[in-house]
Amino acid sequence: MILLVSPKDVAEAYEAINGGADIIDVKNPPEGSLGANFPWVIKEIRSATPNGMLVSAAIGDVHYKPGTVTLAALGATISGADYIKIGLYGTRSYQEAVDVMKNVSNAVKSEDPKKIVVAAGYADAYRVGAVDPLIIPKIARDSGCDVAMLDTAVKDGKTLFDHLSIDLLKEFVEETHKYGMKCALAGSIKKEEIPMLKEIGCDIVGIRGAACTKGDRNEGKIQKDLVKEIVKICKE
C-alpha cells in the first residue's frame, strides 16, 4: 500500500518527501477537505519534488458546475500535477457526478493521457448532502477515471471508520478493483487504523492530520519523522 501525504506548502512538501511519502498531494486545508491550492504552489511543489515521485493536486470540494471544475482541473494539470483529484461535494446524484467527472477526464486526458484522474466521494456524504459514497466506483468507471476515493467532508475528529463499516469499505475496494481501477481511502485516518486498510486491499492511503504536529490538520505542520512512522506501517 502506498502513502499519499497532503502538504499545504513547499516546506511541508520537503518534510513529506524526506519522510518517504509516495505521493505528494498539494492541498489547501482552510478551503475544505479537498481544498484547492494555488497554481504557483502546485508548480513550486512539483519543482521541489524529485523526478519520478508523483504529485497530486486537490481541485476542491466542488459544486455541480462542470465547466468551472473542468477549467480548474486543466489548470492543475498544466501546473504539473500527475494526479487530479475532485471532491464530489455538491453533486447530488449519479448523473451530476458523472457529468462533472467525464468532462474533467476529457480535459485532463486530452492534455496528457498519462495523467491520473481521481473521483473522490465522502464517507459522511449524508452530513452535507453529497452523492452516496458507495456509488463512487461506478461514477469513476463510467466517467473514465483511474482512481475511486473516499474521504470525509466534515473534519471534526470523526474518521472514515465512524461513517462506514470495515465490511462496506472492503466492498468499496473490491468493486473498484473489479472495474480495473485503483482505490484510495482517506478521512482523518489514525496511524493505528492503517493496518485495517491494508488488510482490505486498499491501494493508496491518504493522510494529513496523522503526519502533523499535535495531529492537527489545520494548525499543525507535517513532520518527516511522523511521515516515516506511517510509511513503515504501510510497507510492513
UniProtKB/Swiss-Prot annotation:
Active site residues per record: 27 (schiff-base intermediate with substrate), 85 (proton acceptor)
Keyword entries, A-Z: Lyase, Schiff base
Source taxon at top rank: Archaea
Molecular function per GO: carbon-carbon lyase activity
Pfam family, one: 4HFCP_synth
Disulfide bonding pattern of the chain: none
Pathway note: Cofactor biosynthesis; methanofuran biosynthesis
Nucleus listed as a keyword: no
Enzyme Commission number(s) from the entry: 4.2.3.153
Record GO biological process: methanofuran biosynthetic process
Leading EC class: lyase
Catalysed reactions, semicolon-separated: 2 D-glyceraldehyde 3-phosphate = 4-(hydroxymethyl)-2-furancarboxaldehyde phosphate + phosphate + 2 H2O
Chain coiled-coil ranges: none
Keyword Chloroplast listed: no
Function: Catalyzes the formation of 4-(hydroxymethyl)-2-furancarboxaldehyde phosphate (4-HFC-P) from two molecules of glyceraldehyde-3-P (GA-3-P).
UniProt-listed HAMAP family: MfnB
Family assignment from sequence similarity: Belongs to the MfnB family.
Protein name: (5-formylfuran-3-yl)methyl phosphate synthase
Lineage: Archaea, Methanobacteriati, Methanobacteriota, Methanomada group, Methanococci
Gene (name only): mfnB
